Structure formats: structure tokens, C-alpha cells
Design a protein with these regions (language model features):
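Basic, Lys/Arg- and aromatic-enriched nucleic-acid-binding interface segment
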Residues: 13-72
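Conserved tyrosine-mediated DNA breakage-rejoining catalytic core shared by Y-recombinases
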Residues: 26-35, 41, 77-115
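C-terminal catalytic core of Y-nucleophile DNA break-rejoin enzymes
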Residues: 31, 98-117, 123-144
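Catalytic-site neighborhood detector that most strongly recognizes the C-terminal catalytic loop/helix
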Residues: 36, 97-101, 113, 135, ...
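Short basic/aromatic active-site micro-motif
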Residues: 57-58, 132-136, 152-172
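C-terminal catalytic core of tyrosine-transesterase DNA break-rejoin enzymes
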Residues: 63, 67, 73-74, 144, ...
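Short, polar N-cap/turn motifs at the start of nucleic acid-interacting alpha helices
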Residues: 82-89, 152-153, 173-193, 200, ...
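C-terminal secondary-structure termini that scaffold catalytic or DNA-interacting sites
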Residues: 122, 209-218
Length: 218
């Protein structure tokens, strides 16, 4: 829809059309729930051993995205200059998002730090922190990883980012405001959507508990 509006605007500016054909229409986009991994699914991927080096690397990059919330373009662009230590010696990722140019400030959790350490001397990482493939190849390997791990979800770097927001942050009590800052969101409107999805999943789980306990009474 955004691309269509852009084309209409360019056509109007160049007098290719006389008026906006959609001027009196208001489109309401239907919200879709972002897919994310549960903590149990994340642990399965972490524990899985891969014999093929390239698949292992893709798993590591995917896990790094889960524990930092970085989008594909940002993790591919990640270089030593984006790593900063604060006055307490804690490691942070500080960089502008490729998509929005908004600064994101992300504390480097132990899992992410161990992945950075694992690839610090890898030749493929010259000038960059991690050996990131092109998006198409990475998503192809992620399908293979999902199959091997028995996870029936469409794994992508988007899934990793959603998992960071929900399972890593919001589920562990991180405020929406802080999640928004770490993800590089302009405000909390998108973050609130993650929180709503998380609430829905909690409710579904509690319904299962309720059905198991339904026969109990005092």
C-alpha cells in the first residue's frame, strides 16, 4: 500500500495523472500477529548440534538476532565501531537502524557475547563482526534448521526480532518503553502490539491449565 501511494504521488507531481484516484478512499490494514519463538523453542535451537559449518553459522546468527533484536540488515552491517563499553564495563551495541535511522541501544546479553567471541577471528568477518550470508540463503538454511529442530514455524530474521521483543524482553518484565528503545522504534505503538500477542499466548496457556484443573473443587 505504501508503494502504491508513492507511485500515485510521483505520478501527480509529474502530471502523468490529473487527480489522486484514491483521494476519497480510506484503507484500513488488517493487523497480523507477529510470529515468535517460545523460550522452550529457543532452547531447542541453542542445544542443537550441526555437523555442517554453514548451517551452524546461520543458527548462530539467528540466535544472535534473537538475543539482540537486530534486523537482518543491521546484523549484516554490524562492525567493531558499534560495540561500546559503558563506565561499568558492560558491553552495548549502539547503532542507527538501517531502515529508520533511529539509534538503538542494546545491552549485549551473555549468549550474544559468546557468539561475538566465537567469530572474532574468522576470516569471513573482515571488517564485520559476524559472517552473515545474503537474506535469501539465510532463510533457506533457517527452513532446514526448523525441520531438524522439529519447530513448525516459519523461521526468519523477522521471527528472531519478534522473539527478542516477546520471549526475551516483555516476558521477563522489561518495560515497553525500554523494548522500544532497544528495537529502535520511534514510539511504543509497535511494542504494544507485541505485548498484546504475548497476552493472547499467556491466556491460551492458562486455558489449558484451567481445563486440567476444572474438576478440582473445595
Amino acid at each position: 500500500m505504501k508503494n502504491l501511494k508513492k507511485i500515485i504521488r510521483i505520478a501527480l507531481e509529474n502530471d502523468w495523472i490529473k487527480k489522486d484516484p484514491f483521494a476519497y478512499y480510506r484503507f484500513k490494514l488488517e493487523e497480523t500477529d507477529p510470529e515468535f519463538l517460545t523460550m522452550d523453542e529457543i532452547k531447542i535451537i541453542l542445544a542443537k548440534e550441526f555437523t555442517i559449518k554453514r548451517v551452524e553459522q546461520v543458527r548462530d546468527i539467528f540466535v544472535f538476532c534473537i538475543f539482540t533484536g537486530l534486523a537482518f540488515s543491521d546484523v549484516k552491517d554490524l562492525s567493531p565501531e558499534h560495540l561500546v563499553k559503558d563506565n561499568k564495563g558492560e558491553l552495548w551495541i549502539r547503532k542507527n537502524r538501517q531502515k529508520t535511522k533511529i539509534m538503538c541501544n542494546i545491552p549485549v546479553l551473555p549468549v550474544a557475547a559468546s557468539i561475538l567471541d566465537k567469530y572474532k577471528d574468522v576470516v569471513e568477518c573482515t571488517g564485520k563482526l559476524l559472517p552473515v550470508l545474503c537474506n535469501q540463503r539465510m532463510n533457506s538454511y533457517l527452513k532446514e534448521i526448523a525441520d531438524v529442530c522439529g519447530i513448525h514455524k516459519n523461521l526468519s530474521t523477522h521471527t528472531a526480532r519478534h522473539s527478542y521483543a516477546t520471549s526475551i524482553c516483555l516476558a521477563n518484565g522489561v518495560s515497553m518503553e525500554n523494548v522500544a528503545k532497544m528495537l529502535g522504534h520511534a514510539d511504543t505503538s509497535v511494542t504494544k502490539h507485541y505485548a498484546r500477542v504475548l497476552d493472547q499466548n499467556i491466556f491460551k496457556d492458562m486455558q489449558k491449565v484451567n481445563s486440567c484443573l476444572s474438576e478440582l473443587a473445595i
